[in-house]
Amino acid sequence: RIEGAPKGTKGISLFIVPKNRKNTSGALEFNDVTTVADFQKMGQKGYCTTHLGFGDKDDCQGWLVGEENHGLNYMFLMMNAARIAVGRGSSAIASAAYYASLQYANERPQGRKLASDGKKNVEQSQSLIIEHPDVRRMLLLQKAVVEGSMSLVLLAAKYYDLESTAQSEEEKKKYNTLLEMIIPVVKTYPAEAGTYSVNNGLQVLGGYGFCSDFILQQYYRDIRISAIYEGTTGIQSQDLLGRKITMNNGEGLKLLVGEIIKTISKANAHPELKQYSDSLSEKIKLAEKILQTLMPHALKGDFEKYLADASIFMEFFSLVIVGWNWLEIAANSLQALKDENKKYSHIFYKSKIETMKYFFEYEMPKAVGHSEIIMNPSSVTIKKEEEILI
């Protein structure tokens, strides 16, 4: 922050501060940049995370990048790409955990199926745990989260490419707006749901999942930071509800809903998908109801109340966006089966459709609970006069 700069984020400037600098003779000399601490982390131990000290001996120089007081704007040019990268990395870790737990479930015999009388036949061979419904539920959850997360990352890449290759300013603006709308979700859903997914992968292994003999425990430690760095879940949620939803009088939200409606129309061409497209349509109406409930708080300047449950809104909104992606995937897969498209195997397309069903039947219903929390007039999380957290 340059002396005399405005208070708050508007007074932040961007500087390059090298470890070494050139002196007047052109030789390199130390720039008084030191490593103060090496943090001992829970996970992500493949690289160092350090605390740097600048100018401990009052002999450190930095070079201004761009204009004074524009640092935060410059940083966000990098930040959007970094947030997409976090979503991509979270998807990758969750994917590795899914396939590790899937392999284990296909190899580990444990327990027996119940007979029609509700008892186990001890003479029968033990079943592989992948045959047990509860284990299959945990595996399906992982598959739904992992592939749903990857679809978000690919959607962001698609919008970025369409913006970059747009033939008109109007088209460029459209895809930039759509990209801006989904970036908080692309960062947050793979991080939060991915952590939950890896947790289920670890659970598939039982006690072994907790031991270093298997890699699931490392995946769990490694993915946990994803909901923290490059903007915590709370910050992403406030960005979504406080800025993205309201920007340009809701233009971005209207564009996004328009894209979702296109998928619903495509899915409605397949009677097999009607119940799922109807479910997504209902969630869009529910989103409108939520915003109609919240907006009066923003309009009268009560932003604390408006944003109090932003993280819950993020969970709701993420389910809608990922559900949209899954419906698109299922519609394309069903059409490929009907067209006898041989690009991928029959089971590949079938697995996409069945995973979509899991998402809509097990994950999407959570959106209703989230909506009830958000629209509840109670303000239990807002601090009152007396502190009750004792």
Positions of predicted regions on the chain:
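Alpha-helix capping/hinge segments and adjacent helical runs
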Residues: Q44, L155, T177-L255, Y358-K384
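Alpha-helical support elements that line or immediately flank enzyme active sites
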Residues: G87-A100
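A short core secondary-structure module
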Residues: R1-F30
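Short, glycine/acidic-rich hinge or "gate" loops at secondary-structure transitions
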Residues: N106-N121, L154-E171, L202-D213, A336-Y344
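Gly/Pro-rich turn-and-neighbor structural signature
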Residues: H132-Q203
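Short beta-alpha connecting loops at secondary-structure transitions
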Residues: A37, M75-R83, Q124-S125, P133-M138, ...
